[in-house]
Amino acid sequence: GIPLVVTVHSLEPLRPWKREQLGGGYDFTCWLEKTTLEMADAVICVSEGTRRDVESLFQIEPSRLHIIHNGIDPDEYQPAKTHAVLDRFGIDRSKPYVLFVGRITRQKGIIHLVNAIQHFDPGFQVVLCAGAPDTPEIAEEMKTAVAAAQAKREGIIWIGEMIDNPSKIELYSHAAVFVCPSIYEPFGIINLEAMACGRPVVAAAVGGIPEVVVDGETGYLVPVQQMNESPFEPTEPAKFSRDLATRINELMADPAKCEAFGQAGRRRAAEVFSWSAIAQKTKALYDSLTR
């Protein structure tokens, strides 16, 4: 008689690249997810996009689906004044940089960002804080692509290790622009982290990202034509990379707009996505199930 609540952060059927990592275990995780979700009294979806996906993939009454976004602590994620991490990784303080933070996976779309570097205007650095590759194959693909980009452009810094939160916050805080080229992203907490640190975001307009990043206000959303079903790879990957570069170049050439977008992002993160606001919604749902 105890209610079961499940929170969905991603969906296995929409991540077929996990088979590269899990092998036959991928079929088991798909079955386990389906079984758990369909028996739950309530399913928390971290975005409207996730809710639509759950509704289309599983036999769940719409009344059992509830949208409660992920949250953030704006006191932890706020602009940092220190520069130790920049010095540690050889980032030139006198030059602006574009930043990526994330794992090396198909989902995060980092290869499309690396391919966009050839279209970047000169004069700024590119910092790729990217580690934990899903497979040896994608690790090698990343290594080859970055080496090719570095052969043609100076100022590409690849941080291949997973770093702690204070270090990550420092990287966010001093970036001119944060970039999220994900091709599958149910919510995209990294965008929220960057916004809370006062940085503008250029992100792919997929999944739950448009519910976080407000186009033309806290950053830019880049449309991407994708396959209609998983693995959702861009149908025109070269165009997607060029479009990312166009928006990045636009912001990098306009520090005043970067600052305005960054301030708006910080306000939005603190007012809409603080953990106190998210906790109230979560408590209300649990209260409704236990009355």
Language-model-derived ranges and their functions:
Residues 49, 71:
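Carbohydrate-associated surface elements
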Residues 72, 125-143, 157-161:
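Glycosyltransferase donor-sugar binding loop
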Residues 95, 139-166:
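Nucleotide-activated donor-binding/catalytic signature segment of Leloir-type glycosyltransferases, i.e.
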Residues 200-203, 213, 220-221:
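Short hydrophobic beta-strand element within catalytic cores of glycosyltransferases
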Residues 183:
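Aromatic "clamp/platform" in nucleotide-sugar-dependent glycosyltransferases that forms part
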Residues 2-5, 14-35, 55-56:
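Nucleotide-sugar donor phosphate/pyrophosphate-binding loop at the beta->alpha transition
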Residues 96, 100-119, 140:
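A conserved mid-protein helix/loop that constitutes part of the nucleotide-sugar donor-binding site
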Residues 170-175:
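Short alpha-helical donor nucleotide-sugar binding micro-motif in glycosyltransferases
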